[in-house]
Structure formats: structure tokens, C-alpha cells
Amino acid sequence: MAEVRVGENESLDNALRRFRRQCSKAGVLSEVRKREHYESPSVKRKKKSEAARKRKYKYNK
């Protein structure tokens, strides 16, 4: 989890901006969205193979 300590002369807006940047770098929001709904292993494999097929098609085009 991202953690930000607010300095003595630092505004709350700057600290909030740093916190949001750290969260985005750590991938917190994307992880939350990914885990929002359960996805069975078979569905994960299907999505992964479909993405690979799309990449391959795009590359050969």
C-alpha cells in the first residue's frame, strides 16, 4: 500500500498528488478493478489466448 508522510511546510494538495502518483505506479487501482468480480481460471485462459491471438494478428498485418 502506498504511504505518504506530509512534511511540515507541505500543502495537503501536494501530499495528495504524491499519494495518487504512488498508487498509480504501484497499480493499486488496476488491481482493485481486476479483483472486483471473480474470474474463473478457464475464463482467464480464454482471455489470455484471445489477447495473444489479437497481438499476433496485429503484428502480421
From Swiss-Prot:
Domain of life: Bacteria
Positions of the UniProt region annotated as Disordered: 34-61
Keyword annotations from UniProtKB, A to Z: Ribonucleoprotein, Ribosomal protein
GO cellular component terms listed in the entry, alphabetical order: ribonucleoprotein complex; ribosome
GO BP of this protein: translation
One Pfam family from the record: Ribosomal_S21
Molecular function terms, GO-annotated: structural constituent of ribosome
Ribosomal protein among keywords: yes
Keyword Transmembrane helix set for record: no
Alphabetized InterPro entries for the sequence: Ribosomal_bS21 (IPR001911), Ribosomal_bS21_sf (IPR038380)
Composition bias, Basic residues: 43-61
Protein family membership: Belongs to the bacterial ribosomal protein bS21 family.
Protein's recorded name: Small ribosomal subunit protein bS21
